[in-house]
Amino acid sequence: MLTTFTAPAFAGTWYIEDGDITISAGESGNNVTQNKETTVNDHDTIITNREEGASSHTVTIDAKDKDDKVEVTLKDVNIDASSRSEAAVSVTGKGDTTIELDGDNELKSGAGHAGLEHNKTDTSGELTIQDKDNNGSLEAAGGFKGAGIGSAGSNDAQVKITGGNITATTSDDWGAGIGSGSYGTGTVEITGGEINATGGYLGAGIGGGCNGSGNVTISGGTITAAGSDGAAGIGGGYYNGATVTITGDAVIKNASSTKYGAGIGGGNGSDGNVTISGNAKIENATGGYGAAGIGGGAFSSPDKIGNGNVVIKDNAKIDNVQGGAYGAGIGGGIYGLSNVTIEGNTKVNATGGAGGAAIGGGAGAENNSDNNGNQITIKSNENGSPTINAVGGGTDEGEKIVIGGAGIGAGCESNADADITLEGKVTITATAGKDNVAIGANGIEQEFSGLAEGSSITRYDPEGNDITLPTDPVPAVPSSSGGGSADASVQESVFPGLVVTDKDGQRISYTSIRGNNVLSLRVGRFTASLRASLATLRQLRAEGIDTITFQTILCSTSLSVDELLAMGGEDTEVVLTHHIRSSALTVGGKAV
């Protein structure tokens, strides 16, 4: 027999130890049922524990009709429903439910269920978790196939979080920390709070469970998210992709995957579609084995390759992003291509996994069926100009990776092209992995022209030698103060006493850059020779120059002036010749 009490404006505290609780929308408040007794018009429904230990009783919130609004406060609740194979708290119905967090709350559900469960359907309402007083926390653990917060197994999920200190995980496998259980789509919106989410085996930290996709928008809060094997930290679960938007003032402290999933993006064998904008900040994103830090997951089969489609814009900052072995820092997983756009007042620091590009393709990628390779655009706009530091992935003897990745472009053992576009004002430092290029693909350093004043491109080989092309824009000359000379000078023709000749022995012009005690000479040829007498070098040494660097398109050599001066008399000629990637030095006609 069900007993109903009718009362005006009732504010009730309900103790979970007294029995299961069901809450629905009434005419002017909540209808709360416990032990077959219903109280109506409850305007401040608070659910709590009378004692410290966990209760196995559950809470069901049913905003049944489309216009229903149900608001419930969880205050120091501790529910463990794992023995009942039920959800500790479940939210259903076509209407909207808001859960306020007060105090410390713990929810643990049984197999097949989420810790705090909301299964999304075509007609379901919205679940919002909030912490208006900034004094609430929630620890939620799902059972086998269920998310920590989100859906049960084989269901889609919808969750919106606006605040609270929230820790979400699964006590078993296949579910996301926040998002969907297995085989579902996790639709997650986070606008605030301090979030720590860990996926179960094959589940994303935030996004999709096993075989589940992620549809994630984060516009605020501080986030730490870890995906388990095959799943992204933020994004897709095992065997599924993701659409991830990080914007506003969101801070991603760390997003990572143990293996095969991107830090942010796709799960194993899946693409990652990621947009980072506004004032968002990524402090660290790390891809699992074979996956990108931001972008595509690892290769699974010929028809399941993790490509990375990434846009970074506005004032976004990427402090550190690291690809897993074979994966790009930003772009494709192993065998995966990239479509990356970086624009505006952005700052990016990216490193490729062993064999992967820092920004671009994963190792072993091929052009797609339309014969398109990696597409990379870096440009300024009305918001400002980008600053990029890109370090190509190195080698790994244990993985038999003997060639590194490009700083910007293609990964190792890749036949994929790299269509790289630079527009406006850019500041780029790119370091090549072993036997790869700093910026480009297929062994060719790409040249650029028409960039705006103030642009800078600096290229390094893996040993840190400057291999900047003579055609690259150089850093702006520091302005002097107090009438003193600047620290660096640029001369667009020749430096007195130093002659550069082409392959036919004809004199050609070059660019000379003096910075402190180093004189750099740059020429846009594959083959060229630098010629100088020891008398000229002695004069340079008297002016404070102790090192001369000679740079052609694919080769850079540094010479010690003191060592050369010890090799002969004043009239002795020094000739340094570059041909493609090789160099040869003679002093007085003798090879050194």
Language-model features: where?
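A composition-driven surface/loop motif
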Residues: A7-S480
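Long, contiguous ectodomains of secretory-pathway proteins
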Residues: I46-N49, K69-K75, D80-R84, T92, ...
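Bacterial N-terminal signal peptides
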Residues: M1-T4
